[in-house]
């Protein structure tokens, strides 16, 4: 087992990474607050891992809520169901919420924990690659709104993250590839050596070769933990974690939540960010080619869907958390391994990037 620490003073917590962790009862037990546990999971994950988790929680008063699966269910209405179940039991403010699932479950369960009785403890047990390397770490919790993705939420840190790599054995190929998009992101924004490693070993990660998979998860989590420790609430450097996300969120919202997986949209968004970075003179054609080649080898989209026309794309991008005083800011690449947040681009260059990306 590997442990990565997220250093946030009194709110610091560990990320546990390894095989068979769901069966190690003591790992979760030392982070559970109180004697009441609500497990939030979904219809896909529950038949696979809920019983295993509950076997380790026999000393607690447990309940579970099983939600429908998919980004389209990450809504205020479904969040209400979590609150309803917490209140019907009822659970006190000395309970612990456990999120068992991918990014959607983690985001919603975390947001519910942040709000319920003004905040209760929660634990992340991510079961997808994307959740293990990104969404479970850092305390971002949210639901979507029809006008924008993740626009209603809170920063609220978990007590721990338990990333059992065995859960990736049941992850379908599309979800695995989508998770690899967020792994690639870390190499692009701040870790060129990792990017180079991925160019050589992405096929091993996709083949679920254990040592490659664990290395990719650990390296990703260490990168994110360092960024979160430096800027928990995204007032500075943490914003670089959004490489590809402004474009990607526009794709997700424009197509309808769930049509593309989050990682697929981010992959297309990173390709667009690389293109705009080249137009600004920051990346060479060769460097952009390296980005596109890795995305292609990962089986990820490199273009935006033609269903979203340019005017609509720009309209959707304007509903973004990085917009300040009506000014759109984007995460772009000064070079491979170095990202910046900037509004220093002309609208005609942005429109040219959108035109080129749309297929």
UniProtKB/Swiss-Prot annotation:
* Example GO molecular function: metal ion binding
Binding annotation for Zn(2+): 182, 245, 262
Cofactor stoichiometry and binding remark: Binds 1 divalent metal cation per subunit. Can use either Co(2+) or Zn(2+).
Q: Which cofactor does it need?
A: Co(2+); Zn(2+); NAD(+)
InterPro entries under this entry? Dehydroquinate_synthase (IPR050071), DHQ_synth_AroB (IPR016037), DHQ_synth_fam (IPR030963), DHQS/DOIS_N (IPR030960), DHQS_C (IPR056179)
Query: Per UniProt, which keywords does this protein have?
Result: Amino-acid biosynthesis, Aromatic amino acid biosynthesis, Cobalt, Cytoplasm, Lyase, Metal-binding, NAD, Nucleotide-binding, Zinc
Its chief place of residence is: cytoplasm
Q: Name one Pfam family in it.
A: DHQ_synthase
Q: What does this protein do?
A: Catalyzes the conversion of 3-deoxy-D-arabino-heptulosonate 7-phosphate (DAHP) to dehydroquinate (DHQ).
Q: What is this protein called?
A: 3-dehydroquinate synthase
Q: Which organism is it from?
A: Nitrosococcus oceani (strain ATCC 19707 / BCRC 17464 / JCM 30415 / NCIMB 11848 / C-107)
What gene makes this protein?
A: aroB
């Amino acid at each position: 087992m590997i442990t990565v620490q997220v250093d946030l003073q009194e709110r610091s917590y560990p990320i546990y990474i390894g095989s068979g962790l769901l069966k190690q009862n003591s790992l979760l037990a030392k982070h559970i607050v109180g004697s009441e546990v609500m497990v939030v999971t979904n219809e896909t994950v529950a038949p696979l891992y809920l019983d295993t988790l509950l076997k380790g929680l026999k000393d607690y008063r447990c309940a579970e809520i099983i939600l429908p699966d998919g980004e389209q269910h990450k809504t205020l209405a479904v969040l209400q169901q979590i609150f309803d179940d917490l209140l019907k039991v009822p659970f006190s403010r000395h309970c612990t919420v456990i999120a068992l699932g991918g990014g959607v479950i983690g985001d919603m369960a975390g947001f519910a924990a942040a709000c319920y009785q003004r905040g209760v403890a929660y634990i992340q047990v991510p079961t997808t690659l994307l959740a293990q390397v990104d969404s479970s770490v850092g305390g971002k919790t949210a639901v979507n709104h029809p006008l924008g993705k993740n626009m209603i939420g809170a920063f609220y840190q978990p007590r721990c993250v338990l990333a059992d790599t065995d859960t990736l054995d049941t992850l379908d190929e599309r979800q695995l590839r989508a998770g690899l998009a967020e792994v690639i992101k870390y190499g692009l924004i701040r870790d060129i050596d990792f990017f180079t490693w991925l160019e050589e070993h992405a096929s091993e990660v996709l083949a679920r070769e254990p040592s490659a998979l664990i290395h990719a998860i650990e390296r990703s989590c260490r990168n994110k933990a360092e960024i979160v420790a430096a800027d928990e609430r995204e007032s500075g450097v943490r914003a670089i974690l959004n490489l590809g996300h402004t474009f990607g969120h526009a794709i997700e919202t424009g197509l309808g939540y769930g049509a593309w997986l989050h990682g697929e949209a981010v992959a297309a968004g990173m390709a667009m960010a690389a293109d705009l970075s080249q137009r600004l003179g920051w990346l060479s054609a060769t460097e952009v080619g390296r980005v596109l080649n890795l995305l292609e080898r990962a089986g990820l989209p490199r273009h935006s869907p033609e269903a979203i026309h340019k005017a609509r794309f720009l309209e959707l991008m304007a509903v973004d958390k990085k917009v300040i005083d009506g000014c759109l800011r984007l995460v772009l690449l000064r070079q491979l391994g170095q990202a910046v947040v900037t509004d220093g681009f002309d609208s005609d260059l942005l429109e040219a990037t959108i035109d080129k990306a749309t297929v």
